[in-house]
Structure formats: C-alpha cells, structure tokens
Amino acid sequence: YDNLKAISEIIIPDKNLRSQRINYVISKFELDSLKEIKAKYLSGGQKRKLVLALALLSEPKVLLLDEPFAALDVLTIKMLQEIIVNLQQESSITICICDHQARDLLACVDVAMILSNCKIIAQDTPSNLVKNIRAQNAYFGDSFKIN
C-alpha cells in the first residue's frame, strides 16, 4: 500500500482521483490482504501484481512488459496470463510483451511477432505463428523440424 500511495502522489495530483485509482488497482489485483506487508516480503507473483498495479495507476494507453514471466512458477505464470488477458478484454490498453518464453507469451496475446537482428521475421496470431516455417527457423534454428 505504501508503494501505491507514494507513486500515486507523484503521478495523480487530485486526491479523490488518487484514492479511486488506488482502490481500483488494489481490488483489480486482489491486493487487499497484502496492504500491510512491505514489498520486500512479497512473493515473486505478488511483486509482479504490485508492479502491474503501480503501472496501471496512471491509466496508460500502452503498457510495456519486459519478460514478465521470468523466474515465476507455473501457477504464478498462469495467474499473470489471466491478468493480462483480462486487462486486454476490459480496457483499451495496448500491452506489448517482450519475452523469451514463447509458450508463456503466446498463451495470452492476440498477435505475436518474432524479431531477429532487429527485424520482424514473422507476425501473426499465436496459432498461425507456431505453424510458420520462417518463425520456427528464426526461433529454433534451421535444423529444427516438426513432423
């Protein structure tokens, strides 16, 4: 709660709006039970939820997530994927995710792209992208084959 309050005081000048936004993100990310716990004592998944809550305080139009699934257990990854999907469905926010874990990423996006040497190699829906030979070669190497 202290983190949310401190950041909101910087980015949201209006006290009433600040309080509304804090209450919204606390509710949205189910942080009620964690209000009295210092951030350094939170689990990895709880910290990810807090970071997303902090990012959404200012109601951004674009949210950039750099390797959000790194160092998380399977259950926490699933929870984070659900949060990302819900955010996409409930708001007009554009979420850009950069991650090396294709399986985790493709489970929660509408469109994905593979970059190689700063160039887009393939861009498509997740279901089409996994079938794309150029994407497979760029991601796995030329010697990778799916039978």
PLM segments and residue spans:
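Conserved catalytic motifs of ABC-family nucleotide-binding domains
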Residues: 59
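Conserved ABC ATPase signature
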Residues: 38-42
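Hydrophobic anchor residue at the start of the ABC signature
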Residues: 52
